[in-house]
A protein has these predicted regions:
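Bacterial N-terminal signal peptides
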Residues: 11-22
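N-terminal secretory signal peptides that target proteins for export/translocation
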Residues: 1-8
Length: 284
């Protein structure tokens, strides 16, 4: 397992380096020439958007460095939450963020955990300590991220969440036999196309993250299935199924929409530099 892990990390580093060589020099040159102006970094999904672009192989183009995706603000992926993420009539502002209210059937300890998080104002949120958000929360934070499509994998580059990157293998492999032996924040992800949707199956998580900012917990038994569908030029629909018998009595499903930000690139974000007074984050 250790040899496989080392090879996997080297492959990830090589893939990331190749992507950066393809993308970053041009971006840096543009900024030096005064051409690096970016648009707004917080946007909402738009109505009446043009069709999604496609790659030469016919698959939907999920971005590939031409811009970034941004979830605006999603606190609670069950639909109970703040403002725009709540289930309400959003008029002509485009697709709703969280699309429906769901009531996960939680085990008693998980239900108590969520109530305690609410009571103490999320003072123990792992992300507040600059730890990775995990999944599916990584796709619901207010930080831009990009998706790159390579012949045998997808690469997710995140601005937030400790500047994480994520690899989704699309070369037809199955989950490794020891995927759950060495759990991680983002687990092991295997993807395949179903029509215009990229379906990503992930296992092998540790239990050190929350599913969302509302504090929905999970265990190392977590199994996440995400379906990414670029429904138009400006909208990415994310459908998520949570299956964790250690925290929930049965699988549950949620979904949300996030907006396309053309020309936006993830910036350097060092969480620790602004995280100087944790001892006073005491909640109630």
């Amino acid at each position: 397992m250790r040899d496989r892990f080392a090879v996997s990390m080297l492959a990830a580093a090589a893939s990331l380096a190749a992507l950066l060589l393809m993308v970053m020099p041009g971006s840096a040159q543009d900024k030096q020439k005064g051409k690096g102006k970016e648009g707004p970094r917080i946007v909402r999904p738009k109505p009446n958007s043009p069709p999604a672009p496609r790659m030469p192989d016919g698959h939907v183009d999920l971005g590939n460095g031409k811009g970034s995706w941004n979830a605006y603000v999603i606190k609670d992926i069950t639909g109970h939450g703040w403002g725009d993420q709540a289930i309400e009539n959003v008029g002509n502002r485009g697709p709703q963020l969280v699309e429906k209210v769901v009531e996960p059937d939680m085990l008693p300890w998980a239900q108590k955990f969520v109530l305690d998080v609410d009571a103490n104002m999320s003072k123990d949120d792992p992300e507040s300590k600059c730890l990775p958000p995990g999944l599916p929360r990584e796709d619901a934070t207010p930080f831009p991220f990009q998706i790159y499509q390579l012949p045998d994998r997808l690469m997710f580059l995140y601005e937030g969440g400790a500047h994480m990157w994520r690899i989704v293998y699309t070369d037809g492999r199955q989950h490794s036999k020891d995927a759950t032996d060495y759990p991680t924040y983002l687990g092991e992800s295997i993807g395949h196309w179903e029509g215009d949707s990229m379906v990503v199956d992930s296992i092998g998580f540790n239990d050190k993250s929350w599913l969302d900012a509302a504090g929905h917990p999970h265990t190392e038994k977590l199994h996440v299935i995400q379906k990414y569908t670029r429904t138009s030029l400006d909208n990415l629909h994310i459908d998520v199924t949570i299956d964790d018998p250690g925290a929930y009595k049965k699988p549950w499903n949620t979904s949300w929409n996030i907006a396309w930000m053309p020309g936006i690139t993830p910036l350097e974000y060092i969480c620790q530099e602004g995280n100087l007074d944790l001892k006073h984050m005491v909640g109630k």
